[in-house]
Amino acid sequence: MGNIVLQLLAILALCIAPARSGWLQGTATFYGGADGSGTMGGACGYGNLYDQGYGINNAALSTPLFNNGASCGQCYLIICNYDKAPSGCRMGTAITVTGTNFCPPNYDLPYGGWCNTTRPHFDMSQPAWENIGIYSAGIVPILYQQVKCWRSGGVRFTITGLNYFELVLVTNMAGSGSIASMSVKGSSTGWIQMSRNWGANWQCLAGLAGQALSFTVTSTGGQTIVFDSVVPAGWSFGQTFSTYQQFDY
């Protein structure tokens, strides 16, 4: 117990990201290759994680953590539980990762494998995982907590779809990192409630082409921001629009 207490004190002294929850127990593996290139894309819909502001410190989340995509973009501070696996852990180190993908159960394995439907498990990019674990260990017990996300620049909106179907991908979100609810307003409409389609993609079934668009986004931390006329009237499907606004929580 003494080792883990000392480790936690050292980590807490180093961490500048304020915790959003207490320490919880879980496990972690890695995927995506030594350069992490295999982690690009994923079930949150972010695509190239470098372009979208997330980088290589990312993880695929097991079912209870992924929460059907509601946790996409959330940040987690992770340390290896040295007391449980001294031969597999790097003592005194920590890493903050963003949830960018889903780690599904493998029903060819007993109980669905490491990413089963009840286990809190992070399948991290290999470069991120090797900050806390020894490569030969493969899987390690961890302690984790959700923390505030820090991003460079403002929130971004990418619009895809066709005709009366708009699909909006929200990226580079700081604070809690994830969306609780979202609405859109055209220059000729009132506010229209959107719904999650998949991952960080939110949908609207309305004919908004040719209109300037505004968004209201409420984070899972409870902060609401209105992005007024962030999309000009001449927009086209496939475009990304950057803002100067950002979430604190």
Swiss-Prot record:
Keywords: Cell wall, Cell wall biogenesis/degradation, Glycoprotein, Membrane, Secreted, Signal. Residues 41-154 form the Expansin-like EG45 domain. Residues 1-21 form the signal peptide. It comes from the Eukaryota. It is found in: Secreted, Cell wall; Membrane. Belongs to the expansin family. Expansin A subfamily. This is Expansin-A18. It comes from Oryza sativa subsp. japonica (Rice). The gene is EXPA18.
